[in-house]
Regions:
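Transmembrane alpha-helical segments in multi-pass inner-membrane proteins
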Residues: 47-59, 185-192, 198, 202-262
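Membrane-embedded helix boundary and interhelical linker motif in transport proteins
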Residues: 20-67, 71, 226
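Hydrophobic core segments of alpha-helical transmembrane domains in multi-pass membrane transport
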Residues: 36-40, 58-64, 92-100, 139-148, ...
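Helix-loop-helix "hairpin" substructures at the membrane interface of multi-pass membrane proteins
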Residues: 126-206, 230-236
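Short, non-helical or kinked segments that cap or interrupt transmembrane helices
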Residues: 16-36, 50, 79-84, 156-159, ...
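Single conserved hydrophobic/aromatic residue that forms the stacking wall/gate
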Residues: 1-9, 13
């Protein structure tokens, strides 16, 4: 349940970034990792209150998202080949991993839960749902609803929608495209910090590669649900999370990742646009 709801949240964030910037931010999982390390250092090393540590993580990750977009992605936004941006995104991901490796080393960092909540026991105690899982599920639903309301009800959200539909037309209407995309990355990276906190609360161990696989699986779920669709991303996260859980329970825990990526191949062959994705033909 926890992995399912966490993936929902990652999907909604990554989907919105792609829909507006028209690029896959493969460094998103590594921003989650950085946010987790910030909380680890703040709580275990500096002795900060967990709430202050979470706020510090959100601020740092938000600023990091803006810097990454401005330095690494913006100069290549109008590149002749979309592969240039894709390769840069992968490069940023490896850069963040190796910087974390230099600073904190390869050893696994363990620490006490940042979020400590009572568990919910069902069926006479035979089914136990941890407090972190409950918070993650509710948080995923609230974030999806909040993003949809933000996009539909605010001027900034409407600007994001306009940029995602047609950057050129949006610019002609007076929308600052660069600012809009920067705001998108800021929001996505800030929420990634929250994802990092919840991830470390559920699995209190940390390495420089903590965010790599969750980030890739988030991309798979986004493709499954339909890139560019927030509800589709949410559904994709739920379905893939359930498939992964049942795969571990009834097939093999070692095959769980293979099942996820097998679903990606099937979706790309059968319905490349995903469950709720739209087949949009771009005019050249």
């Amino acid at each position: 349940l926890h992995s399912t709801s966490r993936r929902q949240r990652q999907m909604c964030i990554r989907d919105r970034v792609y829909g507006i910037a028209k690029m896959l931010n493969f460094a998103h999982g590594d921003v989650i990792m950085v946010g987790s390390y910030v909380v680890y250092v703040a709580v275990s090393g500096m002795g900060l209150n967990p709430i202050l540590a979470i706020l510090l993580s959100i601020i740092i990750c938000t600023l990091m998202g803006v810097v990454i977009e401005g330095v690494a992605y913006r100069p290549l936004r109008n590149a002749a080949s979309p592969l240039a941006v894709l390769i840069t995104a992968i490069g940023v991901s490896y850069l963040l991993q190796n910087v974390a490796l230099l600073i904190w080393g390869a050893d696994t960092k363990s620490f006490s839960n940042v979020i400590s909540l009572p568990s919910l026991k069902l069926a006479g105690g035979s089914i136990v749902i941890t407090g972190v899982t409950i918070v993650t599920i509710i948080g995923g639903i609230l974030i999806m609803a909040g993003l949809m309301l933000f996009i539909s009800k605010t001027k900034t959200g409407q600007a994001m929608l306009a940029v995602s539909e047609d950057k050129g037309a949006a610019q002609l209407m007076g929308i600052n495209v660069n600012k809009t995309i920067s705001i998108t990355f800021a929001i996505g990276s800030g929420l990634a910090a929250i994802a990092g906190v919840l991830l470390c609360s559920a699995y209190p161990s940390l390495t420089p590669y903590t965010g790599a696989m969750p980030g890739i699986k988030a991309f798979v779920a986004a493709v499954f649900g339909g890139i560019g669709s927030i509800p589709g991303a949410f559904i994709g996260g739920v379905v893939l999370g359930i498939l992964e859980i049942f795969g571990k329970a009834y097939i093999s825990s070692q095959m769980a990742d293979a099942i996820v990526f097998g679903v990606l191949i099937v979706v790309l062959v059968v319905k490349p646009t995903g469950i709720l994705g739209k087949n949009i033909q771009e005019k050249v």
